Amino acid sequence: QAVLIEKVRNHANISVLENRMAVDLITGAKLGLTAAAERSRVLGLYVLDQTTGRVEAIAAAHTVLATGGAGKVYLYTTNPDSASGDGVAMAWRAGCRVANMEFMQFHPTCLYHPQAKSFLISEVLRGEGGLLKLPGANGELGERFMPRHDSRAELAPRDVVARSIDFEIKKRGLDCVYLDMRHKGEAFLRSHFPTIFARCLELGINIAEQPIPVVPAAHYSCGGVVTDLAGRTDLESLYAVGETAYTGLHGANRLASNSLLECVVFGDAVAENILAQSRELPAALPPWDETRVTDADEEVVVAHNWDELRRAMWNYVGIVRTDKRLERAANRIALLKKETEEFYSRFRVTRDLLELRNLETVADLMVRSARSRNESRGLH
């Protein structure tokens, strides 16, 4: 990543705009153009400059959505804080199709710690003999529970392990379960898992002496904005790649490492397609209208709604779903969306508000997709 960033910064034809967040795409239809070809074209986007609080209009001959997944829609995720589904939400609002939004892959073991909410505890630890156990009394560990769920115990596929942990946590009202590696010894753990050992030690957990608190966490979005094999979406001059896109590669589940290959292959395909097109910039775009908004007086509402949304998604649209749970989620998300849209129309935008708005859009799409699939398949 560091090498890639350095190459981007040093490239003569790339201008990096930092501390910016996309607000929405600008289409011909949004500007009131009448010709069919112009109405379906993306002309650029509005962008929030987080240092000044001002929204800028940026014209573009071609726009590529590469904003990553939407793991932050859940209470626990291995994704970075920026994984708020921005690209999917913006594309949907602009008129693109999305698909397979119900298929969210969950990793079974994310570290449960307030200072490291997205640190992934590799499945290799279970492959090397790690045991999943319930919390017990007086600070001791309880029983090992995986043999009750699958004959392969801790070596069962990740979806089975994640579902089993989720079952135990929700059935017993637990915060987490524990991955016990103490029987492997400090020398083995330091040599085989140096990064995990060091990070846990920084957080006050010596995994040679203490069990690791873990929870399942949202890991990878298999759905996204529908594209063709060149990364083109339903809108002219708009592309989507990576976890933002639904290319059809992953289907209802993702095989390990295929996501990286997808980024490389489709990233190249998008670049080749853009190079073959005209790169003439559209005419000047209208400025962002702030004549009817003021500074927010109750920003705490955004934080509260964010927390409520993520908890609702975790409880009702998580690893195990039912019609009743999905109905409850749909009702709660509808109320949250209504509140946020009112907030959005009255106050100046902030990063937190934009991310909440996008997360609510993505959450709604996930629930609608899940309710429309009346079968258990893949990750649903």
Task: Label each PLM-derived region with a short phrase.
Residues 133-155, 165-168, 220-222, 226-240, ...:
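Glycine- and aromatic-enriched mobile tails/lids
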Residues 90, 96-212, 264, 273-280:
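An anion/pyrophosphate-binding glycine-rich loop and adjacent beta-alpha core
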Residues 18-41:
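A conserved short coil-to-beta-strand element within the FAD-binding core of flavoproteins
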Residues 1-6, 17, 77-85, 110, ...:
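Short beta-strand to alpha-helix junction loop
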Residues 8-22, 98-101:
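A conserved beta-strand/loop element that lines the FAD pocket in flavoprotein oxidoreductases
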Residues 51, 60-62, 66-71, 244:
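Glycine-/small-residue-rich beta->alpha transition segments that form the dinucleotide
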Residues 194-239:
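FAD/FMN-dependent oxidoreductases across multiple families
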Residues 52-62, 234-237:
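Core beta-strand elements of the Rossmann-like FAD/NAD(P) dinucleotide-binding domain
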